[in-house]
A protein has these predicted regions:
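Bacterial N-terminal signal peptides
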Residues: 6-15
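Conserved small/polar residues in nucleotide/adenosyl-binding loops
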Residues: 1-5
Length: 331
């Protein structure tokens, strides 16, 4: 186990050499002479979303810093193997947090320049807590994990209800697992099928206009076009029942109703897509947000993510709450 961890650390540094070699890469193309993005891709990352304040405006770690941080992370994980803790979670064997070795940025956020999310506007409402802990609030529940109670399914987070995956967006944001996506292409459509929750986003490339502004969708309405060898996808018409932006480690804020999302997909070598997105949401943030994230080619298949396999997990959550209420009455 330790030997594998050391090799993973060394891969961080060796990845820099591979990145330089990619300068000579010629983009493979489909039969329609479009850049070929087809296949299964993984967007895991061990880079934090926001830059730790100690790095200031520095975009990149030195190789020595990258090794030191990774070593400290592994040491903390090994030191935390406490047999007294509960077992209702996953261990590091199941977590997908390695990411591309050549991504040694200090943060996934590249704008603002400090690598941190811009301040929210005064009227932006925090719609959820960090780490999926239940909070007080009212319906609709716009965040992904956790909830505001257990009176009914509408009190639970969107990913608990198998409506929207907590990492699939759009946009993609790496989480602890299931950071996979499969891309299909035809001449006039670009199809993005996320592992969680097994949802396919069909992006027309035919220069058609967006749907009417009154029609609102969970994943918004996407339209794409080519900027040389980069695919640009613009998405709007999100509904007001999802958060504007947020992760397990960052506050979950606002609604997505006024959000405008621009994604850019660029092949940088045979095994990598540079994925970049910009969020503009004046109802939630005082400035735009840009994130850059490498996606790694996966030599394998994407299998169905069945969520609650019939959603009995949600049913049992509510059933357990009713039993606890009955037990309290019987005391």
């Amino acid at each position: 186990m330790y030997k594998r961890q050391v090799l993973a650390i060394l891969a961080i540094v060796s990845g820099l050499v591979n990145a330089q070699a990619a300068d000579n890469y010629t983009v493979s193309r489909t039969e329609y002479d479009q850049p070929d993005f087809q296949g299964v891709w993984n967007f895991s990352s061990n880079t934090p979303l926001e830059r730790p304040e100690r790095f200031g405006d520095r975009e990149y770690l030195t190789p020595e810093e990258a090794i030191a941080i990774r070593t400290a992370t592994l040491a903390a994980t090994e030191a935390g193997l406490d047999a007294d803790n509960g077992v209702g979670t996953y261990n590091t064997f199941w977590f997908e947090m390695a990411g591309r070795g050549d991504n040694i940025r200090t943060s996934l956020v590249t704008y603002p320049a400090n690598g941190r999310l811009p301040p929210p506007v005064e009227s932006a409402v925090a719609v959820g807590s960090r780490a999926g802990i239940d909070v007080s609030g009212s319906r609709p529940v716009r965040f992904m994990v956790g909830g505001i109670g257990m009176d009914g399914p509408e009190d639970r987070g969107l990913s608990e209800r198998c409506i929207v995956g907590f990492n699939a967006g759009p946009p993609f944001l790496p989480s602890a697992y299931n950071n996979n996506v499969q891309i299909f292409q035809s001449r006039d459509n670009f199809v993005i099928m996320t592992e969680m929750v097994h949802d396919a986003r069909i992006v027309p490339l035919d220069h058609s206009t967006h749907i009417d502004d009154d029609i609102r969708l969970w994943s918004g309405d996407s339209r794409g076009y080519w900027d040389e060898d980069t695919l640009v996808v613009e998405t709007r018409n999100f509904n007001d029942m999802t958060q504007s932006f947020g992760t397990f480690a960052a506050p979950q804020l606002g609604t997505a109703y006024d959000k405008f999302l621009t994604e850019r997909f660029t092949r940088t070598d045979e095994f990598t897509i540079n994925y970049e997105f910009t969020i503009e949401d004046p109802s939630t943030f005082t400035d735009k947000i840009t994130v850059q994230l490498p996606m790694a080619k996966v030599d394998g298949l994407l299998y169905e993510y069945a969520c609650h396999e019939g959603n009995y997990g949600l049913l049992n959550t509510l059933r357990g709450a009713r039993q606890e209420e009955q037990d309290a009455v019987d005391l």
